[in-house]
Swiss-Prot record:
It comes from the Bacteria. It comes from Lactococcus lactis subsp. cremoris (strain SK11). This is Small ribosomal subunit protein uS2. Residues 233-255 are annotated as: Disordered. The gene is rpsB. Pfam families: Ribosomal_S2 (PF00318).
Amino acid sequence: MSVISMKQLLEAGVHFGHQTRRWNPKMKPYIFTERNGIHVIDLQKTEKLVDDAYNYVKNASQEGAVVLFVGTKKQAAEAVKEEALRAGQYYVNHRWLGGMLTNWNTIQTRVTRLKEINKMEEEGTFEVLPKKEVVLLNKERERLEKFIGGIADMPRIPDVMYIVDPHAEQIAVKEAKTLGIPVVAMVDTNADPEPIDVVIPANDDAIRAVKLITAKMADAIIEGRQGEDAAEDFVAEEAASEESLEELAEIVEGK
């Protein structure tokens, strides 16, 4: 049984790609058809590739992998943070800072600064400082928290990265490739799948689609760490794989 059923994929709109004029030809193997100027992703392939991604992440998690979730656009930011935290992992959900991984030591100095400011407040230092200085410290902390708060406790460079929309996160993908970090990603029809190690062809612009796939990656981590019973909603609804391509086309066309 698939970890996500065909019905769930359809209901979340995972099959809707971009306008045909915006496509990346390298995504052709994952495209089922074209309707009204929009590419339709082949959900039979997505269903199988989600399973592959789930197993890949689960197996990595069993080995104690550190997983970094990345998704900085508004449709992804909330799900990326929520699911990373649920899985006990780390995230970047605002702008990716160039060198976030390739200049890891420099980023760590900013992490140290964030922790210093938090410690100052915890120890009561804020109470004896001038109000103007406290305001400045809070502004600095807010900015640091926004950009690096999700990796402040990450013990090392990640072993695996999960990325929503590698087309938008090209800098993150490039840094992962430079460091040899495998990338699992939701890849829409406008993106280049070649740099991605584990491709999940999917609509990366719909909040429901992003939430569905991202939650399954979190489930995979939880299952890998704690066993099958710990993963929420691990068993998908009865798979609708028997639906023929013709039936899928009818659903897409709204017949």
